[in-house]
A protein has these predicted regions:
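Membrane-interface interhelical linkers
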Residues: 1-49, 59-68, 119-152, 173, ...
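Hydrophobic/aromatic residues within transmembrane alpha-helices
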Residues: 4, 14, 65, 91-97, ...
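Residues that define the loop-to-transmembrane-helix transition and helix capping
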Residues: 12, 72, 98, 175-179, ...
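Hydrophobic core positions of alpha-helical segments in small-molecule transporters
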Residues: 16-17, 50, 77-80, 100-103, ...
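Alpha-helical transmembrane segments of compact multi-pass small-molecule transporters, enriched
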Residues: 21-25, 77-91, 103-106, 187-191, ...
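Hydrophobic/small/kink-forming positions within alpha-helical transmembrane segments
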Residues: 27, 52, 56-60, 82-87, ...
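Loop-to-transmembrane alpha-helix entry segments
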Residues: 78, 94-114, 118-121, 147, ...
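Selected transmembrane alpha-helices and immediately adjacent juxtamembrane segments
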Residues: 144-170
Length: 287
């Protein structure tokens, strides 16, 4: 997403193309296709509609929250939502959580706060004026306005999205995940097309073919990362998978920002990365 800013790509159009290539990759790699009648009869069909909508809904929430509450607050709200699928693993799915793993999850939350919240705040991101107009109302309030409602919605929205993914995985049974994931991204694509059409009709943006280039890489990466997460759900409990996954994403993002974008890591970031390693070890230890 940082590359979208560097090359001045339209966020909504690049996001739409991301869903085009994510869905396309899934359909090209799946082993079999459902007919329309078979698709509607799938036990995961209804949940996949909700999940596809939820993908793009949480994105709009995050862009609006970035405008109103700032990047740091938004990122923290998103990553700390790992608490919800972890609790759902215990309450809804009957998973067991021992003391060592619990301590690991607590350390994981501390690590997330340090890695995401301990960044140098001297640089502010460029925010497009057409981002989530219905939510943000083009109100560029920046870091100073700590609006609590949107970050709270991000927290519950992102956590709910993770739970929806687990529920769809359970409904899928032993079938190949490719077609289901491709269909979820296809639903997100339909909503993305509506958003881009709205921007173009209202004159909020102009059509950019170059946005497709940004969507190619992001879409293929998103599809395969989602495919890996869905298949990991078959091997690991929520209480292990989601904390480790979120720590991994945040750590890789921090290191990528340092290597590619010359971001300065503070001592809090380094401490957070060290704690993250300890947290992963504790969470994955067998009781």
């Amino acid at each position: 997403m940082r590359l979208f800013e560097r090359f001045h790509l339209d966020n909504h159009q690049a996001l739409m193309w991301n869903y085009v290539f994510a869905a396309g990759t899934g359909f090209l790699t799946c082993k079999q296709f459902d007919t329309p009648a078979q698709l509607v009869a799938e036990p995961w069909f209804g949940l996949s509609l909700i999940t596809g909508f939820w993908f793009i809904f949480t994105y709009l929430l995050m862009t609006a929250s970035t405008q109103r509450s700032g990047v740091t607050v938004t990122s923290l709200s998103s990553k700390l939502s790992v608490v919800l699928p972890t609790l759902a693993g215990v309450v809804l799915f009957g998973e067991r959580l021992n003391f060592v793993a619990t301590m690991g999850i607590v350390l994981a939350l501390v690590a997330l706060v340090l890695v995401v919240g301990g960044k140098n705040k001297s640089a502010s991101p460029r925010i497009d004026s057409n981002i989530a107009p219905a939510l943000a109302r083009n109100d560029m309030r920046g870091e100073a306005n700590k609006n609590w409602l949107l970050p709270l919605l991000i927290f519950f929205g992102t956590g709910t999205g993770d739970i929806l993914m687990k529920l769809t995985e359970q409904r899928n049974g032993a079938d190949d995940m490719s077609f289901m994931i491709a269909f979820i991204y296809f639903i997100a694509l339909l909503f993305g097309i509506l958003i881009v059409a709205y921007d173009l009709i209202r004159g909020r943006s102009k059509w950019q073919w170059k946005s497709a280039l940004g969507g190619i890489g992001l879409g293929v990466i998103n599809y395969f990362s989602t495919y890996c997460v869905y298949n990991a759900m078959r091997c690991f409990d929520n209480v292990v998978l989601f904390p480790v996954y979120n720590i991994g994403v945040v750590s890789v993002t921090a290191l990528t920002g340092w290597l590619l974008f010359k971001e300065i890591l503070t001592w809090k970031n380094y401490l957070g990365l060290a704690i993250a390693i300890i947290a992963v070890i504790l969470i994955t230890l067998k009781p």
